[in-house]
Amino acid sequence: MKQNLIVMFLLISFGSQAQGFLTSKNIKIDFSGFVRNDFIFDSRKNVCACDHLLEFFPYEPVYDENGEDIYAQPNAHFLNTFSRFGTRFSGLELGKATVSGYIEVDFTGYSPTNGIRLRHAYTSFVWPKTTLLFGRAWHPTFIEKVYPSVLNENTGLPFQVFNRSPQLRLTHHLAKNLDFIAGAVYQFNYANDGPDGKTYRYQREAVVPNLHAQLQFFNENWVAGAAVDWKSILPRNATAGTNGTFKTTEKLNTWAALAYLKYTKNKFEFKAKSMYGQNVNESLLPGGYAVASLDASTGTETYTPLNHMYNWVNFTYGQTWKFGFFAGYLKNLGTSENPIGPFYGMATDIDMVYKISPQLIYTYKNFMFGWEMSWTTAAYGDIDYTNFGKIKNAENVTNFRNMLSVAYNF
């Protein structure tokens, strides 16, 4: 009882002090977004999300009794679910910090009736040299200053991180053109795969957040940076063996490292990024992990991550009429130890994926009309359990996508 009274007293005291620090100056509410319609033609069926808006790679062929690929089926879509609406609130000050909030939704929710999906929801505190962000935003490995300029809503998948998660992110200006960025991230609907399917439970039960550190240089023409990312998951909290059921605390700790570059000059822009990642399938990238060893008496497992390289380059030229080109390549490097299986993750039987994609976009004030073609090839094969889970006997399968988009921005 005494502890509750002390806590209540401290909260009341803090609240009264905060009212003295928090001031209102020119409260503003700004709206933004766009109305967008997309027509899409695919030469075959694909692994995708958001009702075909987010294309990853073509399905592995499945052959019927006549030897025909069931998934070699052209299909077309006319969609408007990528339309977006955002609201920014500003005008508060907390001491020397300006305070703002942002919330954004689109209509790609998990529903056949265009359900609303929350994209961003965060509060920012901005001091002269430091910014602190609380809430749901792009994962720090996304790199908001350097991501592909493509018409396709997949924003460079499956070569570029696509992940919005709850986080605490600090950005500090070390010098005029140099920032240090640190983040602590928890998974939500962008989550790892595992024995119970895709769920954030694995990371949350490991308790420690996904930790991130990054250095970013920038000036009028250049942005360049490098980052490291660490994560721990607990795939199981109990196992069953011949001697019964036992609690387990066996975790899988993994790393990712990346470097990126952007150059802008007049109407020309060039971007590139390369990332080495272990078990980063929560970011909608091919990857995962496998069981490395098993104690039959207790059911205790150890795990080994899949290692991948993800690379992309992108350039655009123009203003009213803009031509662009994107190319991406990823490679499955296998597991860190020889696996015994099973594998958990995304596309664990794919050896490599590449994509080439030109685009042409016309913009006039708030109006945009664009065309984009993409050629995506994935190499499916067999997992070699004697050679670190690498893929053998791989065969290529390709999808050709044509896309037309019309949008009005506000």
Residue map of PLM features:
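Outer membrane beta-barrel
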Residues: 20-53, 61-190, 207, 212-223, ...
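Extracellular loop and loop/strand-boundary signature of outer-membrane beta-barrel proteins
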Residues: 70-73, 108, 151-156, 192-201, ...
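Outer-membrane beta-barrel "beta-signal"
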Residues: 394-410
